[in-house]
């Protein structure tokens, strides 16, 4: 079973609402901005997180971080996990991903655009994508699971390169697909 522990704050957590218009086949997202976290508050969270990590086997971190935090937020949390000898999965994007992989998470789940950003490679074909993922793996990320959207995914790890193809379906909504992938 998965344990949970809440780090309480005065502010309410944000809501993210996704609406699917079945008539026009249009998706609309409402993403509340959320609260701002100061460096001092984040240090308090890091202290709490350090204790929590001791109880975990694997830690998954995904998405964005609150306003007020810079690109090092996940990097710092990944380091805490690694220092505790825990496996850590990082599923984020942009500067958070770029800085986060410097701490060598156990696994990342980038998409093609993120692989391009991390390696500077064009990734115009499958072999280029694999080579880019191999570069990240060689730099210390144990498992690089690359999402290819409707074309499935592939994984680069010490045991080799593995490709997963998915059946063609009419996707109604892709919200949560990446989260589901790292959960599996």
PLM feature segments, named:
Residues 79-83, 98, 126-184:
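Conserved phosphate-binding/catalytic region of the ribokinase-like
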Residues 8-9, 18-20, 31, 61-62, ...:
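Short beta-strand segments
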Residues 8-15, 38:
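Gly/Ser-rich phosphate-binding catalytic loop and adjacent alpha/beta segment
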Residues 12, 33-35, 64-67, 114, ...:
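Short glycine-rich anion-binding loops that position phosphate/pyrophosphate groups of nucleotides
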Residues 58-129:
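Conserved beta-alpha-beta core of the PfkB/ribokinase-like small-molecule kinase fold
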Residues 2-7:
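Short, small-residue-biased leader/transition segments that mark boundaries at the very start
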Residues 53, 101-102, 138:
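A short, aliphatic-rich alpha-helical micro-motif
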Residues 19-54:
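Conserved phosphate-binding/catalytic loop of the ribokinase/pfkB sugar-kinase fold
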